[in-house]
Amino acid sequence: MHGFAEASGGWESRLETWEREYLAGLLEQVAMLLAADGSGPPNGLQDAHGAGDSRSEPRLGESAQDRAVLAALDFDPPGPGRSASSSLTAAPPALAPVIDALLPDASEDPEVALEMAGLTRSPLRALKQERLEAVMAELLEPTGVGGAVRIARGHEQKWLGALNDVRLVLAKRLDIDGPEAAEEAHAIAWEEAPEDEDEDALWRRGIALSYDMLTWWQESLVTVLLYG
């Protein structure tokens, strides 16, 4: 994974095929979460013990360790042209705090918040889903030079918003509520895995790696926007 750099008319970043597919999958899952209204978590956002990744061979550029982490997350990457709304998976009550973070109340007063929810949540949900799917489309079929992921000038806020929503979901799953918790997640992401690592620990390490990976990539975009 390479950070963003300025390019003609925008910004570009070169990613391995599996990295693009994986990030697109995270975006798709958040979009699915926004659209869900029943029970049963999206792949990869569940607590662990999923069916696992059924692929027998790693994708191009994907290491055996990367594949093991994705298998622990029960991750199934989307294909080009597939939208989040094409295969909805409903969200269980356990993910209610995540949805509340993505679609916050318009008021601290419970009665006012309930009254405003119908007016504010639907437009916000639509906005977030639209930008998530736009970013996902570029990741699956990049338009930059030599297959690089491209952000056209003027679309930066759309990308930052979409990436931030995914980070927010991952942070909630990791219980990150401050700098210390973020540092702990970073340490989990890069610590050497014990030989007897159980499924729960592997799942948490996978989510931590995802959070770390996405944070670094987003920060590379912010840095190039601020300093060139």
Give the predicted meaning of each segment.
Residues 1-151, 156-228:
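Charged, alpha-helix-forming regions
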